[in-house]
């Protein structure tokens, strides 16, 4: 099934403005701070009053049923107002609402009372993760969940907690921010929060975290040896590229021109050549034979 785009209009906005006092968020029924990056539709109308329309996504909820989810239209308005809001949208004039929107408000622990292991400082042996720690988002919750679970298990075995540093992983940045700075709104992990973001890449996560995983037993000896072998092969390939030079010949020039790539003025070692954004290992294999797996090349 396909997804579709649609937009709010002035009638939608007027219905919302006329009923703001009935909204849980604007009527004073809820006092908590909502997530910054997914505001309700009434929040959008108030905060971005200069916008003539807001984009919405119509998403199928199932391959087997005719239910659709209206993404970007979250609200805490009463049901009768929701009916008017939905029917004001072009294309949904005759839509039937099967599940009405609603707002939730929940309590959260002050993350300053949580240890870097995600154990509570006040209640020993209580490990928490996710929204209750003041975060928002699936990945944020999952990241805390695996750390909390690992550390709860380690504590049962009287072993030292797993504490990831800010230079180790985004999880390390997230937890460090929470337990040292606290938060006054639902916390989201952003790349801009990580000062080591250039080395916290998806393609080196296995090598970054392999020793931790091995020490706490979350990977097998066989998996660990495979990672060590991969690391050794990467070092071997890097050294080879640094020690071998591409000399500019007529044949080399022809290959560069055929690929619409500027020909180097002088010979370069392959490692330095790879620093050019248009050069890949696949292109370099026009000149040398690399007998390494794709995993190592990546």
Question: Predicted regions span which residues?
Answer:
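Mobile "lid/hinge" segments at catalytic clefts and subdomain interfaces of large enzymes
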Residues: 175, 183, 187-215, 220-222
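Terminal amphipathic helices with adjacent charged low-complexity linkers/tails
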Residues: 40-56, 65, 77, 228-232, ...
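Glycine-rich phosphate/pyrophosphate-binding beta-alpha loops
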Residues: 131-139, 195-197
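Internal hydrophobic alpha-helix adjacent to the cofactor/substrate pocket in enzyme cavities
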Residues: 141-162
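Extended, charge-enriched "interface" segments that sit outside catalytic cores
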Residues: 193, 210-298
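A glycine-rich dinucleotide-binding beta-alpha-beta segment and adjacent secondary-structure elements
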Residues: 57, 69-135, 163-176, 295-298
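A glycine-rich phosphate-binding loop feature that marks nucleotide/adenosyl-phosphate handling sites
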Residues: 32-39, 100-109, 161-178, 192-194, ...
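Rossmann-like dinucleotide-binding core of oxidoreductases
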Residues: 1-63
């Amino acid at each position: 099934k396909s997804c579709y785009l649609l937009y709010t209009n002035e009638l939608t906005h007027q219905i919302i403005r006329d009923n703001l006092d009935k909204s849980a968020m604007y009527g004073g029924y809820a006092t908590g701070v909502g997530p910054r990056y997914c505001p309700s539709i009434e929040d959008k109308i108030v905060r971005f009053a200069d916008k003539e329309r807001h984009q919405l996504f119509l998403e199928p909820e199932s391959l087997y049923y005719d239910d659709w989810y209206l993404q970007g239209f979250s609200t805490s308005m009463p049901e009768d107002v929701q009916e008017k809001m939905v029917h004001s949208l072009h294309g949904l004039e005759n839509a039937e609402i099967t599940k009405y929107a609603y707002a939730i408000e929940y309590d959260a622990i002050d993350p300053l009372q949580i240890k870097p292991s995600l154990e509570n400082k006040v209640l020993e042996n209580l490990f928490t993760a996710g929204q209750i720690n003041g975060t928002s988002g699936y990945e944020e919750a999952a990241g805390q969940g695996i750390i909390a679970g690992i550390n709860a298990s380690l504590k049962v075995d009287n072993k030292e907690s797993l504490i990831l540093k800010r230079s180790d992983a985004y999880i390390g940045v997230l937890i460090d921010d929470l337990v040292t700075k606290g938060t006054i709104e639902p916390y989201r992990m952003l790349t801009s929060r990580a000062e080591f973001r250039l080395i916290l890449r998806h393609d080196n996560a296995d090598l970054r975290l392999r020793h931790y995983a091995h020490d706490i037993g979350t990977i097998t000896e066989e998996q660990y040896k495979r990672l060590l072998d991969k690391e050794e092969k990467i070092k071997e390939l890097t050294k080879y590229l640094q020690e071998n030079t591409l000399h500019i010949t007529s044949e080399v020039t022809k290959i560069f021109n055929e690929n619409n790539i500027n020909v180097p003025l002088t010979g370069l070692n392959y490692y330095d050549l790879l620093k050019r954004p248009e050069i890949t290992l696949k292109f370099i294999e026009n000149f040398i034979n690399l007998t390494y797996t794709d995993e190592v090349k990546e």
